[in-house]
């Protein structure tokens, strides 16, 4: 979002590099959409409910326009994305928070500007035991791999009707759960969600009492500390890119429930492109007001926790690859060295 600074750098003859905090697949998608807009006047808003599929160079599989990311379905935001993508093409290089073993197709699809994959860049040190001891103690008391963790990011929240559907799904699934719920800000206010004073106000009557032996409802969650805990066996997530990388780093399979920004694309990549996730609703958009019913959520939770042995194996393998990428001689270690060499040589 600081691409205008590139103009200032040009005035002083300083080469510009972009750091891209999302994945390489979405970077390729951004550049592709900008290209077909300029060449064919592509307007994503016209295709959001169609069965059209896009052949995106950074993906192996066709991308359905019905799950276009929320970030490009607003006219003003789409214009901003186009301007940013054009600036990206002028950079001397793009540094991306990903690694070759995860997004090889996307990384290898880039020619100009060069892409440097230096991830996963994560802060995996957490003091969850000091800041949220009651959560960590509860997890300590659960069997290994038995808990599904539901958390939707710093901006993630649902309506009361949707919370009730999630509650019914969890109760009917019978699985142990740790569920972070947040109160949405008022409709006329741009703000982060807050914690509920009493979750009983928005959950089905008697839900907390009926599930007290298997579940815990919390407010804000120390996500890294929770994902690192051996009791966690699955993660229901909004698919923010950091959350995706964290789930892989700790080897926790993910069920995808995207909400905003580029998260629909991330969900597609995890479920269809990479086979590392389970779908709840890849096309869900928070602004749509659609309620995902409890049956659909329950099926996904059961699939995640009961029938995902192959995916679980793949996620565990990716966990090891994510760590290997960063060590001396690893793919991201080498790519970072290439970036440093290029930057130093000007």
UniProtKB/Swiss-Prot annotation:
Pathway: Pigment biosynthesis; anthocyanin biosynthesis. The keyword Transferase applies. One of its GO terms (biological process) is anthocyanin-containing compound biosynthetic process. InterPro entries: UDP-glycosyltransf_plant, UDP_glucos_trans, UDP_glycos_trans_CS. Expressed in cotyledons, roots and leaves. The keyword Glycosyltransferase applies. UDP-alpha-D-glucose binds at residues 221, 223, 238, 241-243, 246, 262-263. An anthocyanidin binds at residue 261. Its EC number is 2.4.1.115. Signal peptide: none annotated. It catalyses: an anthocyanidin + UDP-alpha-D-glucose + H(+) = an anthocyanidin 3-O-beta-D-glucoside + UDP. GO terms for molecular function: anthocyanidin 3-O-glucosyltransferase activity. Keywords: Glycosyltransferase, Transferase. Belongs to the UDP-glycosyltransferase family. In the presence of other necessary color factors, this glycosylation reaction allows the accumulation of anthocyanin pigments. This is Anthocyanidin 3-O-glucosyltransferase 2. It comes from Manihot esculenta. The lineage of its organism: Eukaryota, Viridiplantae, Streptophyta, Embryophyta, Tracheophyta. The gene is GT2.
């Amino acid at each position: 979002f600081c691409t205008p600074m590139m103009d200032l750098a040009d005035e002083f003859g300083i080469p510009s590099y972009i750091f891209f905090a999302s994945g390489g697949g979405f970077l390729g998608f951004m550049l592709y959409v900008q290209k077909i807009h300029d060449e064919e006047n592509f307007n994503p808003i016209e295709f959001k409910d169609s069965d059209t599929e896009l052949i995106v160079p950074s993906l192996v599989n066709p991308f359905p326009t019905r799950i276009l990311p929320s970030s490009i379905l607003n006219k003003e935001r789409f214009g901003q994305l186009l301007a940013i993508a054009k600036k990206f093409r002028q950079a001397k290089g793009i540094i991306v928070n990903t690694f070759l073993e995860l997004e090889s197709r996307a990384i290898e699809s880039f020619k100009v500007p060069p892409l440097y994959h230096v991830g996963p860049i994560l802060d995996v040190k957490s003091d969850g035991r000091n800041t949220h001891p009651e959560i960590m103690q509860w997890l300590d008391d659960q069997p290994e791999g038995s808990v599904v963790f539901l958390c939707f990011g710093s901006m993630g929240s649902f309506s009361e009707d949707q919370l009730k559907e999630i509650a019914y799904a969890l109760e009917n699934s019978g699985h142990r759960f740790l569920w972070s719920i947040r109160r949405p800000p008022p409709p006329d206010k741009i703000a982060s969600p807050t914690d509920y004073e009493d979750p009983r106000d928005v959950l089905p009557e008697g839900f907390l009492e009926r599930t007290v032996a298997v579940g815990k409802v919390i407010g804000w969650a120390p996500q890294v500390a929770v994902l690192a805990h051996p009791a966690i066996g699955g993660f229901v997530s909004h698919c923010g890119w950091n959350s995706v990388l964290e789930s892989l780093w700790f080897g926790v399979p993910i069920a995808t429930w995207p909400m905003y920004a580029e998260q629909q694309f991330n969900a597609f990549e995890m479920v269809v492109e990479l086979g590392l996730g389970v779908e709840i609703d890849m096309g869900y958009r928070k602004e749509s007001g659609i309620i995902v019913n409890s049956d659909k959520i329950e099926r996904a939770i059961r699939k995640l926790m009961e029938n995902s042995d192959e995916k679980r194996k793949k996620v565990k393998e990716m966990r090891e690859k994510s760590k290997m990428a960063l060590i001396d001689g690893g793919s991201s270690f080498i790519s970072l060295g290439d970036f440093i060499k290029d930057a130093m040589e000007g």
